[in-house]
Amino acid sequence: MSDRCPFRQILIRSRMFRLLPVLAVFSFASCTTVPELGGLVDRGGTSGRKIVVSLKSQRADLFHRGKLVATSPISSGREGKATPVGKFQVIEKDIDHLSSLYGNYVKGGKIVKENVDIRKGGRPAGSKFQGVPMPYFLRFNGAYGLHAGNIPGYPASSGCVRLPKRQAKRFYDAVRLGTPVVVQR
């Protein structure tokens, strides 16, 4: 670029070019995924709480400073819709969460198509999607979370970890953003 380029001359004169590296850093930083922001939220260090989910036993345990304070039966992801295994942290709390994928199509207050996955099939004309309620939702990985739901005694969910409503509320009330969640086989 020559010194005759008007854009370059404007940048040099206004000293805006000094801000470009800073702006670049901030624009890349905004692409960071939420779990990587762990330094900004509680990792269990200050609250001392941790959730451990056992897929084999279909059970979730809540620990406080290493001591078991609550346990609950669960229903994890069914075959083909497995709950992810690994170490995560609570990245969102939503007391009255609604599914954005699973629910019913409703028209005029009446269900016209029930138990749908919006990624499959079409929406009936004039209808609106109504997501399934997922009370006491604790998101720990992408679309996955712990929440109140049906507990049939075996893996039956679409990947989330369902708990009885009373226990879901207890876990919800006890944890903060950043609380570790360990999901093991």
Pin down the residues of each PLM region.
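Short acidic, Gly/Pro-enriched loop/turn segments at secondary-structure junctions
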Residues: 97-104
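Post-signal peptide N-terminal segment of mature Sec-exported envelope proteins
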Residues: 39-63
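Bacterial N-terminal signal peptides
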Residues: 20-29
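Exported/periplasmic cell-wall-interacting domains
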Residues: 3-5, 31, 35, 42-44, ...
